[in-house]
């Protein structure tokens, strides 16, 4: 990871909403935006205590934050989330749709419930988050959606459900970028590879050659790091820093793009 330095508060005066921000990648994004001066809405669904801990961590950076509970798979909840965010901070400049879930299951065993659970959160929710962002963002705002390297990977078994749910988001990104352009709102997606979170801990062994359940985490990290020219796996801060760039005015000419965040990994 790059060395730690005092971060310029280049997003001072901006307000960001990050879904699924109580842990993992979402937490990393929320904290990096806050370090740069943004006020942050920390959305969560069930993990109230971790979300409040993120708010407390943000306060230590000198930025403001509020935790708002909302189940973003339900459109009325999405609407309420945006209304409460606006009531608290007055405006929105940046919306990051981060929430997601992952399933590995043989295609013949996937149930309707599996399909709906994955697509409701990974795909449907992201559409309506982006829709509400378009309606409520100030002109010149930023929308960042969450895809995955899995959307374009081949050779990973039992992965169609997750890969398909993320591939759809890439289509949303390109289309929304066209529709939002007249308001100078940019829309991009990020597509991370493995990032050290609780989801990584549960599923990363699937991506390791000859991986198996119960593999020691050190072996998993070593196996995945071997694919990366930088010799390591990602941490949430890596993803947050890229989102912070996309949120910055300097990123205006980056629009309608899906940005792979793999450290150059080739798998």
From Swiss-Prot:
PANTHER family in the cross-refs: OXIDOREDUCTASE, SHORT-CHAIN DEHYDROGENASE/REDUCTASE FAMILY (AFU_ORTHOLOGUE AFUA_5G02870), SHORT-CHAIN DEHYDROGENASE_REDUCTASE FAMILY PROTEIN
InterPro entries for the chain: NAD(P)-bd_dom_sf, Sc_DH/Rdtase_CS, SDR_fam
NADP in keyword set: yes
Protein known as: Hydroxynaphthalene reductase-like protein Arp2
Purpose of the protein: Hydroxynaphthalene reductase-like protein; part of the Pks2 gene cluster that mediates the formation of infectious structures (appressoria), enabling these fungi to kill insects faster. The product of the Pks2 gene cluster is different from the one of Pks1 and has still not been identified.
EC number(s) reported in the record: 1.1.-.-
Top EC category: oxidoreductase
Domain of life, source organism: Eukaryota
GO molecular function, a single term: oxidoreductase activity
The encoding gene: Arp2
SMART domains the UniProt entry points to: PKS_KR
Keywords for the protein's UniProt record, in alphabetical order: NADP, Oxidoreductase
